[in-house]
Each structure stands twice: as structure tokens, then as C-alpha cells.
Amino acid sequence: MTNKKVYISQKDNYAGAFGLVYRSSANFYFRQSNSFKTTISFMDYWRIKRGISVMVVASTRSMDGKLLMREQLTFKNGSIINFSPDMLRSGIAIFEGAIEIEVFASENMVIPYSAIMAVYEAENSISMVHSYSRTYSPHEVEEGRTISAGEEGCWSILDTQRVASFAIIHNGSDIQPEQSASLELTNVLNKKTSVPFSIPALPPYATFKIIPQHYLPSIISFLDGKPGNAAVSFTLKNSFTRMLVGNNTTDGSEFQVTHSNFNFARHETDNAGEGYAFMLVPPAKFRDLTVVVYPETTKGQYKLETPEGKAYEFKSGERLEITTAPGILKFSKLDGKLPARIVTALTAKAANSNAILPFECSLGVLHKLRPLKGTFWGIVAIGKKYRSRLIIYPMEVLYGEAIDNELQLYLYTQESREPEVRLMHGDEILQLGKGMYLEEIFPRFQETHEDQYGYFYIRCSNYGGMYCYTTLENELGSVSLEHSF
């Protein structure tokens, strides 16, 4: 199965050309047991950024789409909501399903994708991912502002005797009939195999898990102990096709996820013209730090240049993995104009890690079409259970020298509508570029607050070229990295 090509405009995305947005939303895979916890976390950025009051509704559903719980979530006590419904009260040992967060406003919110995080805590690991899927609003369906023909890739598969890969898709508001789908796998030698499989009829709001080992029993020998790649062709009804993708250990002790992205070898995108695109590799002292360029790039020949002066040439369809020093990577296209989107990732383990699974953070590249951005916010761990690093780095290679000599850093919590504030200067700002733990920035604050997820927030009045990452790290050496909103 291959879907009809869809044109994906990055220029429209940058411009916020989504029509009238009075509802924004996000769907998340949700699992709960005595050894596994899912938390849906988000900041009241609608009020903080633009002064917009919103109503938030959370709907918890089973895997077959049945509505089990619907409730209103409020920012009455603080600026952060950390939501994890107790689904084990009825005696269920393990609950698996999905949570939909819907946000409603009487003003145009501009972006229909809510900026929300999911945090997954397994026995030995922690992992996070930002919003990936959403159910379209009726007016978006009527206006044709939908992408439901799924050509999704950028999914690293690590299958071994101890590890199984998986992907999660969420159907929308109508029945999706039974369908023939296809799975294309790529190994470290860039050898490919295509596997057809069936997806049963999906009821409205159903969640479906794709496990490659079920469809290709020889996948472990095909990968031969090295990371590979998967891409999927499928269709949904009235739902955005982005998938949750990841790997878990077969004993359930570790679980690491990121999100898929468009297969740009099949979908189309606009171009960024001549010149370079850039990617930041943060100086965070990870172990086994690897940069991944997924194989689903616009057709053509490319070159990647590292901070050490090494150069790698690759073409569409090839998965490229390199180790590199921290710094700025440069991408160019050797046979035409640079596409607006090249999907990349960072993958690594903590320096002191005994973890089996690395984190993987799906990213992309920055180029001259990306507009200046003045506000950033991202999740951090508050309290003693987990630690967080905050990395704020000026992309001077693209936006010129950072001229701000002070930075006002806000920390929002679930306990107060007002933030903690720290004004940083000179050398402190330089240190943020290398990464600082939250307790180094707000030392007493960390000691006096209960364990929770909060959010940092910065507003840059004079410089719009910052790039930010945060981490969540546990005491066992598991780490997760995500870029900011």
C-alpha cells in the first residue's frame, strides 16, 4: 500500500496558516500499572503568552475507542497541569488506552496542535514526548485541512532478543474500515524489506499498536544487533497520522519513545533554496551520542559536515548514523535546492548509565526560512525524584551574534499562578549554553517543592535565535531529551 502524495508546506507551518482555531488538541498513548505511569503535562501558555483564557477537557478511552472518563482540567491552583487519571481503581492490573486533551477558546489560538507533553515512567526508565497525534475538528475536515493518508517514517527500531520496537496510531472521529498496510524496514547496511500487514477496522477514537516482530519474525536477524529504521503506509479517519514510536525491553523494565515524521520520499515539501541548514548537537556529556539522519528524505544527494571538519555524503533512502563532537552540523544538497525539512535525531545514554535503551529525540534542521522566535518553554522535573538539565543555546551561525546580556528565566509550577524568576547575566548565560541542572539555577526552590513537572519559560526581547533542550534523568541513569516549544 502506498498513499497518494501530499504536499506539506513548511512555509505555511511557519506562518501559522491553519485557518480559524478555536479548538486545539492532542492524543497520547496512556498506560498505567503498578510499575508503569503516564503523566500528561502542560503549561497555561495560552494565558502566559497571549492572555487567552481556555477550557481544557480530558477524555480517557480504551484501546477500542470506548469513552471511559471525561473531565474538565483547570489552572485554578497553578500554571501547570500534571494529569494522570487513576484507572486501576476498578481492580484492573494493567490499563492501556489513550488520552485526548482538547483546548477550547473564544479567541483564535492560531495553532491547532496543543503544546503538551507525555512522560512515561517504567521500572528503570523515564521517557518523554511532545504532542504527536490529534483528532481534527469538524471545520478542518470540511475545509480540507487534514492529512489522514499516513506515510510515516523516522522510526528507529532496535529489535533484539531483549528489545521490541512498536508504534502507536490513533484513529479519529469516524470508522476506519479494515485496510491493507505496509511496513518498510531498513537495516544498517541500508538493505530494505517490505512487509504487508492488515490493520483491522478501527472504531472512532481507537488506538492501534504496530509491532514489527509480529509481521516479520526474522527482524532480529535482519537488523543483526544494529539500529534500523521503519516506515509505515496506512490511513486514518479524521485524525493526523503522526505516530508514537519507540522501543521497550521485553521484560517491561525500560520504555523509550519519540514521534514519527512524514516520509518525505513519498510526501512532498517545499524547498529552502540554496545554502546550508543547521542542527545543534548540545554539549551535554552524554555517552554514545549519535546523530541520526532518517532515510525518508526528499530524493537527492546530500552532505553533512561536522564541527571537527568531517564530511559525510548520503542519499535519500539511506539511514545515516554518525558520532560527532558537540556543536553545529551543516547540511547541504549536492544536486539541487535544499528541502525545507530534513528529519534528524539525537540518541544517547547518560554518562553513568546502565540502561539498555538510549533516548531518541526527533528533531530537524534550521535554515533561513525559519522565522525569529522570541518565546520558549519546556518541561523540567522539580523536586528530588528526577533531575533536569536546561540547555539554551544561541544559533549564531544562522541568526548572528546574541546581543542580550541578560536573560530572565521563569519557572512555573502546579502550585502557583505566579512564577519563580531568576535573572541571569554574562557567564551564567554562557553556562546555559553548555547545560545547567535546575537545582543550579533555583537551588532552594528544588529543596522545598514536592516532586512534580514544571516548565521553564523565557521571552527574548532582542534576539530570536535561541534553541533550547531539557532533560529528565533518573537515579538509575535513564535519560530523556526533548526540544522546547
Where are the language model's segments positioned?
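Gly/Pro-rich, tryptophan- and cysteine-flecked surface segments typical
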Residues: 1-485
